[in-house]
Amino acid sequence: MTTKRRNHGRNKKGRGHVRPIRCTNCGRCAPKDKAIKKFVVRNIVVAAAVRDISDASAYDSYALPKLYHKLHYCVSCAIHSKV
């Protein structure tokens, strides 16, 4: 029978089993190697308020913290949200 992809849509080569993860969007279980991963780095502070906070800060060169978040999507949610 013909196959659609050489890797069968996942990153599992010699492993027999990989643990499932939950989709960030819908909560569906998907294998960890098949899920589409997206690493998001965002500022905690909104861009409009950055200047106000830096002016009000007592420290001169205070770097505002960032928000690091790893998103896992199932295949259908990744296609739907065009990730």
Swiss-Prot record:
Indicate whether Ribonucleoprotein appears among the record's keywords. Answer: yes
Keywords in alphabetical order: Ribonucleoprotein, Ribosomal protein
**GO annotation, cellular component aspect:** cytosolic small ribosomal subunit
Name the Gene Ontology molecular function terms of this record. mRNA binding; structural constituent of ribosome
- Name a biological process GO annotation: translation
Name the PANTHER family on file.
Answer: 40S RIBOSOMAL PROTEIN S26
Q: Give the family per the record.
A: Belongs to the eukaryotic ribosomal protein eS26 family.
What this protein is called in its record is Small ribosomal subunit protein eS26
Q: Which organism is it from?
A: Brugia pahangi (Filarial nematode worm)
